[in-house]
Amino acid sequence: MKFLNLIIKYRLLLGAIFLVFGIIVNLEAGFWPSFVLYLIAAILIIGHFLFGPMRLIQGYMEEGDMEGAQKVIDSIWFPGLLIKPVRSVYFTLKGNLAMANQDFETAEAHMKKSLSLGMPMKEAEGANKLQLGMLAMQKGNMREAENYIRQAIRAGLPDKENEAAAYLQLCSIMINKREFRAAKEYFRKVKKLKPTTPQIADQVKQMEKYISRMPG
């Protein structure tokens, strides 16, 4: 994995080196002896612009190194050249970084751009819509938040932690609408999923105190 990450990190540089060697061999011995070098150079350079360093960005984000992730994403000079599914992931990652920096307007714009391009997997679409729902809640737009979160659940979410977060947000929205029976039903779904993420688990504890005093 580390070797693959190194290849991805230095893919453009390696492509340029192979291209230079290819030109030298071509001048010294002709085209066919240099063909393999040209081919490797083409694969590396084209791969850099079509697929980008998404694997590196995700690695940094999983480690919590947002600064490292930002540096890598800023190194993508021509995002328009990325193939469509990769470009969608690119805008999702930009949205995640903007959210981490509390720049919610920019995050929303990037997430919507990602959705408009089409997500490579249904679970990714669900996670994207869940984040848009949470952004709408940040702005106090409960109707839009509910709409996005319901769409996220229908599309499918990558794991039980995301599912629990979605149902917890719906529970909060129902409380805000004073639909207490629906709120309790969504809270039961959250409890059934048994989330372990500290932030979600803490929210569940806080919500449980409120739910126990709720009518309906």
Protein language model features and the residues they cover:
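Transmembrane alpha-helices and immediately adjacent membrane-cytoplasm interface residues
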Residues: V36-E63
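Short coil/turn linker motifs that delimit alpha-helical repeat modules in TPR/alpha-solenoid proteins
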Residues: I45, L82-V86, P120-K122, P158-E161, ...
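"A position-specific structural signal for the A-helix of alpha-solenoid helical repeats
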Residues: R55, V86, T92-L93, A124-M134, ...
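Amphipathic alpha-helical segments of tetratricopeptide repeats
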Residues: D74-F78, K112-G118, R150-G156, K189-L193
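Terminal, low-structured helical/coil segments at or just beyond the last alpha-helical repeat
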Residues: F3, A183-G216
